[in-house]
Amino acid sequence: RQRQMCIRDRGITVVRDFMREECDRLNPVFFHYITTKTPYVVMKYAMTLDGKIATKTGASKWITGEPARQEVQHMRHRYMGIMAGIGTVLADDPMLNVRVEGWKSPVRIVCDSSLRIPLDSQIVRSAKEYRTIVAYAGQEENEEITEKKEIALTEK
């Protein structure tokens, strides 16, 4: 407030909140975090006409059209991380990366409470190429879990 007065005293017009909405649209992630101290989260999902996330046969790979798939690539490029549950990983074996040449892929995050992610999944096989986090809640140790941890520790 005092700075505004000093500036005004020098004959400079001070306009508060000038083009605020336009400025907020330039970087919504930053402004959201600064004002709320919470992460900016975007949820994307696809749904069939009957409100399901897969067809009656269980197929879920292409229930969206090409424009929606292009927007997904833009979203993946724009944001810092992409998260999927283990159910999606087991059903679809996704890559969770950006497929546009020259665009940066986000950190891939898999929520997997029991560490069921297959070692031959695309996510595990490509972990050297794309930063990947698998979050799990288990306390137990077995040979498979130890192997998955070793793979994770040798990756990025």
Give the residues covered by each predicted segment:
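A glycine-rich helix N-cap at a beta->alpha junction
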Residues: 11-18
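Short, well-ordered coil/turn segments that N-cap beta-strands
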Residues: 12, 37-39, 80
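Low-complexity, intrinsically disordered short peptide segments enriched in small/polar/basic residues
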Residues: 9-11, 121
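Short, small-residue-biased leader/transition segments that mark boundaries at the very start
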Residues: 2-6
